[in-house]
């Protein structure tokens, strides 16, 4: 899984994995920030900090590909990973990267989706899981879900 600073999606996926509600294995967590090392350790999942900047992006993505190969990541999940992946990286992992996006795509693409929804007067947003392509938030949609709120 790839994650940046916001940990709610990562926490939810790790919890679901721990209780058996998420099939498969979590082979590792990669982040461009150092924040989630202790959380990964608590779940017994390898953690890799790969900082990224505009200048270091090619080296960071090469290191990411090395981890994908070394740990045999079958699928790369972007769990609030707030970096745009290069076309080159997307081409090297076709159909193997999915993103969890906090809106009903194709509406409200990119990082400022809550502001976009607010500006348009939208009262309810949900989440979309989609395959990642070189075009931001344009990949084939796997699933859309409304918020899982309850009144309990």
What positions do the PLM features span?
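One-carbon transfer enzymes
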Residues: 1-152
